[in-house]
Design a protein with these regions (language model features):
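Residues that form generic nucleotide/phosphate-binding pockets
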Residues: 15, 30, 51
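Compact soluble domain cores
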Residues: 23-37
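A short, surface-exposed loop/turn module that caps and links secondary-structure elements
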Residues: 33-57
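Enriched for short, Lys/Arg-rich terminal
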Residues: 1-6, 10-14, 18, 57-89
């Protein structure tokens, strides 16, 4: 099984840098799991609806999420990272 190729939006990178070091470590751990299996039950990966239709999200922990989309050639683009507030458009 090949690992998922991940690209990062400028917005995602900015948000990631603002996270606490502890949350950054949790996010990196979740990303490693995501690369191996984007639909691991530990990540609670789910489709988004409404204004975020076409995007997906997975859980870093109980409170924090990553919003992403599947792109060409089996890759994904990480759009946002943070608490549930990232769902607000």
């Amino acid at each position: 099984m090949t690992s998922v190729q991940i690209k990062y939006s400028a917005n995602f990178v900015r948000q990631f840098k603002k996270l606490s070091p502890q949350l950054q470590k949790q996010a990196i751990k979740a990303e490693k799991l995501f690369k191996k299996d984007p639909f691991s039950s530990k990540l609670k990966t789910h489709k988004l609806t409404g204004k975020l239709n076409g995007l997906w999200a997975f859980a870093i922990n109980y409170k924090d999420r990553v919003i992403f989309e599947f792109i060409e050639k089996g890759g994904v683009l990480f759009h946002k990272i943070g608490s549930h507030d990232i769902y607000k458009v």
